[in-house]
């Protein structure tokens, strides 16, 4: 008969979460509190993890941006990052990085999803809605679709 499993210690549970992916301090705290005897115990563990550099809000932000930047715009990613209560300095750095690459990321997503200029106003509106729902700015979306329209017009002239 197999022996019953010992419950994981709080530290083992935290390291298990961190071994799978980066977590923000707020997110890891939320996951650990139900398994702890007190909130102070969790805070002490989180302080220790940060001291050992096993928990880092900066690394979490970089990881999240790396995972999701190809599918979402700056506005959407910043909204998600703000829910993790990262520092203003970290958020500012991430926002600057995202804004510098937003046009390239938006163009790549647009080409993957649509690949051709809109044929009429209804299709144009659909493309704009799709891109804006993913957090890309109106100006970037307009430039990409306008650029696609110009490519279509240039193609018509060469025929």
Curated annotation (Swiss-Prot):
| Disulfide bonds listed in the record | none
Q: Which Gene3D superfamilies match?
A: Winged helix-like DNA-binding domain superfamily/Winged helix DNA-binding domain
Keywords assigned:
Cytoplasm
- List, alphabetically, the InterPro entries matched: RecX_HTH_1st, RecX_HTH_2nd, RecX_HTH_3rd, Regulatory_RecX, WH-like_DNA-bd_sf
| Gene Ontology cellular component terms for the protein in this record | cytoplasm
Entry's Gene Ontology BP terms: regulation of DNA repair
- What's the chief localization of this chain? cytoplasm
Q: Tell me yes or no: is Metal-binding among this UniProt entry's keywords.
A: no
Where is the protein found, in the record's own terms?
Answer: Cytoplasm
Q: Name the family.
A: Belongs to the RecX family.
Q: What does this protein do?
A: Modulates RecA activity.
Name under which the protein is recorded: Regulatory protein RecX
Recall the taxonomic lineage recorded for the source organism. Bacteria, Pseudomonadati, Pseudomonadota, Betaproteobacteria, Burkholderiales
């Amino acid at each position: 008969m197999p022996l019953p499993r010992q419950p994981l210690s709080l530290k083992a549970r935290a390291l298990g979460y961190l071994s799978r992916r980066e977590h923000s301090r707020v997110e890891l705290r939320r996951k650990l509190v139900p398994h702890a005897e007190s909130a102070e115990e969790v805070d002490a563990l989180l302080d220790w993890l940060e001291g050992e550099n096993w928990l880092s809000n900066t690394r979490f932000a970089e990881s999240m941006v790396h995972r999701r930047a190809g599918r979402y715009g700056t506005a959407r990613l910043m909204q998600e990052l703000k829910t993790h209560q990262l520092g203003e300095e970290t958020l500012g750095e991430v926002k600057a990085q995202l804004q510098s690459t937003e046009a390239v990321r938006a163009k790549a997503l647009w080409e993957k999803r649509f690949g051709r200029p809109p044929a009429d106003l209804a299709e144009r509106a659909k493309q704009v809605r799709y891109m804006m729902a993913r957090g890309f700015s109106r100006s970037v979306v307009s430039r990409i679709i306008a650029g696609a329209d110009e490519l279509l017009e240039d193609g018509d002239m060469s025929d």
